[in-house]
Amino acid sequence: MTAQTDVTENIRTRPIFIAIANQKGGVGKTTTVLNLGAALAAQGYRTLVVDLDLQANLTHCLVEPPRDDQPNMCEVILDEVSVAGVIVSTDTPNLFVAPAGESMANLEINLAAAIGREQALRTALQHAAVSEFDFVLMDNPPCLSLVTINSMVAADYIVVPVSCEYLPMLGLKWLLKSVEKVRARLHPNLKILGYLLTMYDRREGITTDVEEILREQFGDEMFTTVIRINTRHKSAPSERKTIFQYEHSRRGRGTEDFSALARELLKRLSLPARRSRRSAG
């Protein structure tokens, strides 16, 4: 059963919060947040991407990372500064980032002692500055942590990238256990919007094997769209560009894939493929 629902009215009054999560590293979480965010922005949806990974890869893909004396999402989550004070515009119209910084390395320790520690991110994002967005996409660290739990608690939906390899597929059971615990204890309405195959290479036999297993297991919860293997996804961040900026062509492989993903995601949410100027405000 898919997470399709009519949120057309909700998009006008509050953002849709989506956590991009998988407890296995190297499956394309940051690439997905970066380029899905850019694809939604290109369709007229004001999109905020939130970097919750201490490596700050998403931040480096878009903007100069904060200096040591500048606040980032660590201080936001710890309620030391407002999220409005860290949101930065990017070179892509409608796309904004809430960056991570070096202080994220201490976030887990400080958050562990906080009251309402699992709710800290959700509370921080309940801000007028965030309500101006249509979508908030959250990039997560490659492990189950308090930060990941915070992201799930703050999210309406989860999108799960799975690279076409054996080990990431095995790791899904741990993610699903985490989701069930969050639903049971903290957020019963949390939904999985879909599973996304990444690093897809039809020439590799393992790709076909993984796809068959996952589509049989998850059925309609699997996105029809796949993100094909593409060396440009590795090259674009070095120039602080999204795949759309880097390929600069509607026929580029990455551009095609993430445009298709955005359309499919919007369809699952019963939202128009393009945000009208009037409703975008």
Give residue spans per PLM region.
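P-loop NTP-binding core
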Residues: 1-281
